Amino acid sequence: LGTRFANRLEQSTYDFGIYDTDISNGSTVFVDVEDSSSLEAIKDCSVIVNLAAVHRDDIKPISRYDDVNVNGAINVCNIARKYGIKKIIFTSSVAVYGFAKADTDENGDHNYFNDYGRTKHLAELIYKEWHDEDPDDRMLVIVRPTVIFGEGNRGNVFNLLSQIAKHRFIMFGKGNNKKSMAYVENVAAFLVFACSFDNGYHVYN
């Protein structure tokens, strides 16, 4: 998602920087949301788009979820306060809803069932607290994507489609299960669009 987002920003009128723990790209500046001192690098930004997260089923120790997703949110908000950055876009997850009912909208109850959903929920609360300190002069956009798929991805969606294409897919039951998915370019395009939002609190599934 980050790469697609950056590619779309390059085609826009925005000046932007890429901040990451992976600095293999020569234009990337090292920033770790767990390290508040490294976040000083973003002090001149007018919009923060936080895509950083820990999301794997085999994360050890479990506290890594809290370190990145929760403490990272605290650090991002603190740097925004320190330098008067008034716009934050945060990619959360539909995992905050847990096993939600069909047609659950942005006002649905949070019934997370794992540490990923729990820490995304807590991060949302931290960002909301930051916004509510000065709601008339701050913008917060929370995006809750479902499974993101697209070219170059080798995750579960790719594996599923690959098995179907090779006629190796084994279906259990009647095959009536439905899965929500989001195309990576659509999510990236929305993030660019969200950079132009007015002050306020905006949440999107």
Please provide the spans of the model-predicted regions:
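Conserved Rossmann-fold NAD(P)-dependent oxidoreductase catalytic core, especially the SDR/UDP-sugar
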Residues: 75-115, 133-138
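NAD(P)H-binding glycine-rich loop region in Rossmannoid oxidoreductase-like domains
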Residues: 33-71, 75, 79, 96-99
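Substrate-positioning beta->alpha
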Residues: 153-159, 173-196, 202
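Glycine-rich NAD(P)-binding loop of the Rossmann-fold in SDR/ketoreductase-type enzymes
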Residues: 64-75, 110, 114, 118-119, ...
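Conserved beta-loop-beta element that borders a ligand/cofactor-binding pocket
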Residues: 125-151
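N-terminal Rossmann/SDR dinucleotide-binding element
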Residues: 1-47, 51
